[in-house]
Amino acid sequence: MTALSQSEPSLSASSDSSTDALVQKAKRHLLQNYKQPPFVLARGQGARVWDMDGREYLDLIGGIATCALGHCHPEVVAAAKAQLDSLWHVSNVFYSQPQIDLAAQLTEWSGLSRAFFCNSGAEANEALLKLTRKVMKDRGTPERFEVISFDSSFHGRTLATVTATGQAKYQKGFEPLPAGFTHVPYGDLEAVRKAVGPATAAILVEPIQGEGGVRMAPLGFLVGLRALCDEHGLLLLVDEVQTGMGRTGKPFGFMHEGIVPDGISVAKALGNGLPIGAMLCKEELGASLTPGTHGSTFGGNPVAAAAANAVVRILRRPGFLDEVQEKGAYLLARARELQGRLPAGRIQAVRGQGLLVGVQLDHKVAPVIAQVHEEGLLVNPAGDRTMLFAPPFIVTVRELD
């Protein structure tokens, strides 16, 4: 064993860490299922990141609405480091305090009663879908299994969640898709009403369609969905993966309409970059997921949960989310000023709430995004013609300018 380990070459010692070499190495070894710009990010602090060559970028996408407190937030770093020094992982066959504390924080903050932890938004949405099936069986109505979701929605990349997603481009090549999903126009309450049938079990909705172009439903849409679900005995499931954790200026997007969903999915900003997701639900629904019905080896991992506890504590501080609303209003105003200065129609729409803003152009955004990368700004597309801005909440007004 000793001789073998001594004879093994040191990959790190012999590797070329230049940008070009790393990009070529990535192309040799990684699946080529992402389109990435030709630079390698190396470190971050606050709302800024630096690449391997030392070039600085203002991060206006925050890991796709994930690094809500910016990069290397000192309180989150301290929480994760302290947990690394005590306990990394035990799986969910044992209790761990960070997970218990996080469940208590999230249920109190959301108004829901039970938490299940996983590792991503897709897994959280899978949990919602499985919960729906199990609840309907426990109610004695197993024939009710269909979920209504919406055109242009996005709920994840697993086979079930990509089927729930209302965008054919993400489903292409993965047919046959699982049965049990119906898509209707977003914001059209009458279309939802017509789609409800004997097999309908739930409605799955995003308060704002982030990946669908930062599309906002008419005010009152969620209220209407809640009433429709109550009328027909359906579950109202709200995907808060992108809109939750304060992104819209309230703890969760559904709170803008004053409703209480049956279940929600949370991820992205929950761990500020560490992988963690959660499904939160009402007490009576959570009773359906008994031991053995669902699980996750890594879900609610002590280190990720410790970081998430720090995130939630910070977000819950008095006045913190008020600042998110103020900065969001400022970003929207500045984007609309730019819209007014450019030739008519160049910017077709500016949409958003809080620090989730979409700027829709009259042409494809890919060349524009490549250009702003060169200028030291990180943004992302939300559809072919919309640029998504989801900066860290700690971004300053000066940085937004």
Curated annotation (Swiss-Prot):
Keyword set, alphabetical order: Amino-acid biosynthesis, Aminotransferase, Arginine biosynthesis, Cytoplasm, Pyridoxal phosphate, Transferase
Biological or metabolic pathway of the protein: Amino-acid biosynthesis; L-arginine biosynthesis; N(2)-acetyl-L-ornithine from L-glutamate: step 4/4
Assigned protein family: Belongs to the class-III pyridoxal-phosphate-dependent aminotransferase family. ArgD subfamily.
Modified residues (N6-(pyridoxal phosphate)lysine): K268
Cofactor stoichiometry and binding remark: Binds 1 pyridoxal phosphate per subunit.
NCBIfam families: argD, PRK01278.1
Location(s), subcellular: Cytoplasm
Cellular component GO terms held in the UniProt record: cytoplasm
Superkingdom per UniProt: Bacteria
Misc. comment: May also have succinyldiaminopimelate aminotransferase activity, thus carrying out the corresponding step in lysine biosynthesis.
Binding site for N(2)-acetyl-L-ornithine: R157, S296
Listed GO biological process terms: L-arginine biosynthetic process
EC number of this enzyme: 2.6.1.11
Gene this protein is translated from: argD
Annotated pyridoxal 5'-phosphate binding sites: G121, A122, F154, D239, E240, V241, Q242, T297
Reactions catalysed according to its record: N(2)-acetyl-L-ornithine + 2-oxoglutarate = N-acetyl-L-glutamate 5-semialdehyde + L-glutamate
Organism annotation: Myxococcus xanthus
Subunit structure: Homodimer.
Keyword Transferase: yes
Name the UniProt record assigns to this protein: Acetylornithine aminotransferase
Annotated PROSITE patterns: AA_TRANSFER_CLASS_3
GO molecular function, one term: identical protein binding
